[in-house]
Amino acid sequence: MKCRFAPSPTGKIHIGNARSAILNWIFCQKNQGEFVLRIDDTDANRSSKEFETSIKDDLKWLGLNWSYTFNQSSRQHIYNEKIQILKQKKRLYPCFETEEELALKKKSLLSSGKPPIYDRSSLNLSDEEVEKKIESGIQPHWRFKLDHENIGWKDIIKGDVSFDAKNLSDPVLIRADGTLLYHLPSVIDDIEEKITHIIRGEDHIANTAYHIQIFKALESSIPSFAHHPFLVDETGKGFSKRLGSLSIENFRDEGYENISLLNYFLFIGSSSNIDPIKDLNEIVKKFDIQSLSRSSAKFSIESLRNLNENTIKLFSYNEISHKLKNIKSNFQKESFWRFIKNNISFVNQAKEWEEVITKINNAKDLNIDDSFINTAVDELPEDPFDETTWDHWTSKINKKTGLKGKDLFMPLRLILTGKSLSLIHISEPTRPALI
């Protein structure tokens, strides 16, 4: 088994294509397969090394590794060989219509109530007519001639999928300037690298119909396909890939654990519950690609945040101490971690709790009567705390001191947090479990 992830280095990796990468990688892990990284950089004007490096860094941070990587921009000689084969087989044919002419044809077909399918008029050109056009300086674009037959496959996620090729336009594979569109280099690379399984978004389903015929034309075996549904927001709308806040880099910078993202993106929209897991082997064991739903999954940043919060609680001090060191925490103690881990959503919030504890330790700065502090400590219930603990505790303090309202809650807040404002207004995820 061999899978690949093939991003275009035209932007940062976001939740949509990150999910494709994660699904391919975990599928290989589950089945002892090989995972490779292909960089689709045939669009020289939009591709950049900066984005390529960013994509690789984000994939590595997620925990994904690959046996090797390659760039499509370095494989033109391989593509040229296959192009000649397709031309010799008469499966690639030159077309000379301008964009304006094609737009008029499309408009005419639609106004007549017909599907906008290319009419193959260029196939009527003789060799002499083609040669004259080229000699006059008109460069053709090249279309792949589809066999008009049923194109079907058993999709690992979607089930039975089929297209009648008569209802599809012959796809353009080569632009007039000689550059290649997505289809041809993708299929050729899958053949050359012996890819056995292709897992990608459902926006590629129509492309797969084209690709199957290109595989056949090049006399290659056809890989297995799996098309996963899109992620949508909580209102059911799709995400823009340009939405920077949903880039993997942004999640990393905010402080999410990579294991939380792996867990969430693998099991969102599946029949499996999304439970906090800290062990990658457990995730691999749990994953079943056929459990993924055929319909779109709703992405919730709140659900992801809660998952990250609950995942952090699973980590022991030994498992997390290096991260405390990385954020330059001054409190490198197991007792500190036990104290804060139930009150944070991200490990980097340990710095906020350092400030809180430092203030609390310096009780004189709080301007609170010592007798009140002693009463609060004496009446503090034993673990475990639950939703009733706060009311029981404050009721006992009220009976002992006679304080109520702000006179009771303000000093308690200062004792617990070192802050005069509620942590609800400061940073929701840092709010202590007790309050």
What would you call each of these model-derived segments?
Residues S74-I78, F230-T235:
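Short, conserved secondary-structure transition motifs
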Residues I424-I435:
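Single conserved hydrophobic/aromatic residue that forms the stacking wall/gate
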Residues S316-T401:
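Small-residue-rich helix-loop
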Residues F251-I259, R294-S296, S300, S329-S335, ...:
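Structural motif
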Residues L412:
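Hydrophobic, well-ordered secondary-structure elements that form the walls
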Residues M1-S112, A206-S220:
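N-terminal Rossmann-like or analogous alpha/beta NTP/dinucleotide-binding catalytic cores
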Residues P94, T98-H227, D233-F239, S247:
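Active-site cores that bind ATP or allylic diphosphates and position pyrophosphate for catalysis
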Residues L243, S247-L324:
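A conserved active-site cap/scaffold subdomain adjacent to cofactor or substrate pockets
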